[in-house]
């Protein structure tokens, strides 16, 4: 009996170590793809699909209950759950089929998911673009570029305000676009990374305290 318990514990530990190594390998692949390609606006890129899904369900749910604040709050919760279930189901199906067919294919698909969870290159590129425009004294260009890293109204900002907003937004987004996705991807692999980024996308879409989302985004 003791031997069975020892063997079972050994197998569990070995399985966990294998899963952790696999997650780290997928994360390394995803990070390399992110630094190489950034966030392309193409249909096959998971983040693009998630944004389109959130935008479509957001409009549908919000318009259906726009005259009832309580119903809007419930609709926002329902939309979040539905999006997460869809993303989780698609991700799990792809991983199951991928690893079933070939370990390398499964690892590649998991790496794609980790890639979609990260936006390190996009953050670096966007912030660099703002700073170059600000140094050149091109206010309109700096205002336009800073919108890629912040959801604030930038139309009335001067150069100093644009630079300050960029620094603050980079500090905030470093956690959302780099540190947190790396953490969840390292522990739970591509599934953990892509689900975290899905929550982040939903929050960025409906979480603002504007008149439009004051109830729906709660």
Predicted feature locations:
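Hydrophobic N-terminal alpha-helices or hydrophobic patches in metabolic proteins across all domains
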Residues: 18-218
């Amino acid at each position: 009996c003791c031997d069975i318990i020892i063997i079972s514990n050994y197998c569990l530990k070995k399985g966990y170590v294998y899963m952790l190594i696999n997650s780290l390998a997928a994360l390394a692949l995803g990070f390399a793809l992110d630094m190489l390609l950034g966030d392309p606006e193409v249909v096959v890129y998971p983040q693009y699909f998630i944004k389109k899904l959130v935008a479509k369900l957001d409009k549908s749910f919000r318009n259906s209950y726009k005259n009832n604040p309580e119903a809007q709050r419930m609709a926002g919760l329902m939309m979040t759950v539905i999006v997460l279930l869809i993303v989780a189901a698609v991700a799990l199906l792809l991983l199951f089929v991928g690893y079933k067919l070939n370990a390398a294919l499964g690892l590649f698909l998991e790496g794609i998911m980790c890639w979609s969870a990260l936006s390190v290159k996009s953050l670096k590129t966007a912030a660099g673009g703002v700073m170059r425009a600000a140094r050149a004294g091109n206010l309109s260009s700096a205002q336009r570029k800073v919108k890629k890293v912040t959801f604030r109204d930038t139309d009335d900002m001067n150069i100093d305000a644009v630079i300050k907003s960029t620094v603050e937004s980079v500090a905030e987004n470093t956690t959302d676009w780099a540190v947190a996705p790396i953490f969840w991807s390292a522990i739970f692999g591509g599934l953990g990374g892509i689900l975290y980024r899905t929550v982040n996308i939903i929050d960025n879409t409906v979480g603002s305290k504007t008149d439009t989302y004051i109830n729906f985004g709660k």
